[in-house]
Amino acid sequence: MRIGFDNDKYCTIQSQHIRERIAQFDGKLYLELGGKLFDDHHASRVLPGFQPDSKLRMFSQLTDCIEIVIVISAEDIERNKVRADLGITYDEDVLRLRGEFMDRGFFVGSVVITHYNGQPSAKAYSERLANMGIKSYFHYLIDGYPHNVALIASDEGFGKNDYVETSRELVIVTAPGPGSGKMAVCLSQLYNENKRGVRAGYAKFETFPVWNLPLKHPVNIAYEAATADLNDVNMIDPFHFDAYGKVAINYNRAIEIYPVLNALFEGIYGENPYKSPTDMGVNMVGYSICDDEVCCQASKEEIVRRYYEATNKQVEGASNQGEINKILLLFNQAKITTDTRRCTVAAKNRQKERGCASSAIELSDGTIICSNSSELLGCSAALILNATKHLAGIDHDVKLIPQSMIEPIQKTKIEYLGGKNPRLHTDEVLVALSVLSDTDENCKKALEQLPNLRGCQVHSTVMLSEVDRKIFKKLGIGVSCEPVKNK
């Protein structure tokens, strides 16, 4: 895989920049964490070389000075809000996040329950946390938030909230999902720290949009494609331009809320230490791009992948035409078509030739490998076999899994488990390959190539089953599909 991003440089300069921001205040910084921390696959796709856990690696250089506070809304507890990607409720995800952080050596200080208005379920959750030895605090609903600045920055506003006791200089504020109240928790803490004579600071840690790349740079356009369902729009930060005469990129919601934040900072400090929403950020991603051409191409392919993702969601009834239209507009801005993604062209050509469901993968060296469905294998399962055979130097005509082994598996699926599709999925093929690898050298060689599929791109002419999607995700492969259900 061609590298476009210097991951080691990023970890070094990003952690250093955060230290510098801490030093600007009284040795106390509340850092609102936006986006994904554990598995930032979007960043790894548009910035080849960026590792999905890069942010964790970077923060590991600051472990001794970090305290993590996890935020959850009482309203989300009350309605049992679920994380769609994990299938667990937000209140359970708080515990999962806490465990993940602690397993990696980070100190998790407490949980803040926001939007509290006496909800019984939120009170019960607080008691549950206490029984587990976890500190929790309540932050209350404030009438007119965020626009009633006079009330918010007063003892009847932020002053009513529990003061969250923290012991370290960098407090990372995170949450299971958006709308949890992370920013309000940070601002409330600034108010209450200030009342105690501590001039604490606030900063926002978001990777995208990249503030020091051009507005229409493919990396930034790819961010708009990723948030098309939210209708986020990248913009030139007018406050930054007015203050410095320099162009910086931010997104519409950050720019729209800045006048309110400006007034709140003035209410807390007497002045605003930040002249623009961009100033509030600490993002150093743009300085770590080492090959712009590679990142541009990867981002263009990601925009195409997002388009297919939206069309697939529409078929499932989970997306609307507006999201698709937004991405098609981004196609024009990036000057791309679906053919920009080479594996897309190859898969569609294969289907025309064979007349059945097909798929294609672009390997890290640019080689295209194709497959199609058969009576024995689905096209995704066949693709994994074809790709690993190629990488292992095994002749394409070699059958890694004999038909005599596949047919009993098919019989079990249909006759005993009540399945309708006899073709083997990717997980079943990998299990079979694993069993055979103990006695078959070719199967062993093919299995050993699985790590080399990470970062590769796949396109399928039919929508994938959930199990195939999960396997591709675990292998680190970017997948797109035509919006056609497999029959």
Predicted segment positions?
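Flexible phosphate-sensing "switch/lid" loops adjacent to ATP/NTP-binding sites
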Residues: 1-174, 189-348, 356, 363-365, ...
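The conserved Walker
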Residues: 177-178
